[in-house]
A protein has these predicted regions:
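Conserved catalytic cores of phosphodiester-cleaving nucleases, focusing on short active-site segments
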Residues: 83-91
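Non-catalytic C-terminal interaction segments of nucleic acid-processing enzymes
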Residues: 1-82, 94-187
């Protein structure tokens, strides 16, 4: 497996990983969860059950991201944080509908902070797109307004939107982080 890193001079530096080294690299992957995120024990329980490292950190935006712990033998001489990934998790369609109705527009400001981030994911827990279309949520916002709001913001911000069952949320967060790592180092 090869790794491409861009040096300050714009020159690509290429490293090759054996399967064993790649597994070691994955053992240095740490899921970061925002210190401002309400603790989601089901996500942390999943990560713990799979022996996936995680830690709480104040993130600039979003709820989850990842880092690679220092591993000089694999080319990571210090902890490396991946600012090109932002995962925002919502508990339900009701929560995101409520975010669009808020007068203080915190959610829209957060989305604006995400515009310069390469990989942005919005994960909505336990509901589905059908719940949006059918109006199966608690909010003053009708289903057509919510759908249009989501589509407009998705187009402007360029984020990926997934509906994920609660029991699969930890796995989804890990797989997104791993995929981002793979696409960063295995180009």
């Amino acid at each position: 497996m090869d790794q491409h890193l861009r040096s300050k001079g714009g020159v690509n530096i290429k490293h090759y990983y054996t399967e064993k080294e790649y597994k070691e690299l994955l053992s240095h992957l740490v899921i970061l969860h925002n210190s401002r995120e309400k603790t989601s024990t089901h996500i942390l329980d999943y990560l713990d059950s799979q022996n996936i490292k995680h830690k709480t950190k104040a993130l600039k935006t979003g709820d989850y991201s990842f880092m690679i712990e220092s591993c000089p033998s694999l080319g990571f001489v210090r902890d490396t944080y991946y600012d090109d990934l932002c995962i925002e998790r919502k508990n339900s369609v009701s929560e995101i509908a409520g975010n669009f109705c808020e007068k203080d527009d915190r959610f829209l400001k957060e989305l604006n902070r995400m515009t310069n981030i390469k990989n942005v994911y919005l994960l909505i827990e336990d509901d589905s797109l059908q719940d949006v279309l059918d109006g199966n949520y608690k909010s003053k916002l009708n289903e057509l307004s919510l759908l249009r709001s989501i589509l407009t913001v998705q187009k402007r911000s360029g984020f990926y939107l997934y509906f994920v069952q609660k029991e699969s949320m930890g796995k989804m967060i890990y797989e997104i982080c791993k995929n981002c790592l793979d696409n960063t180092i295995l180009k």
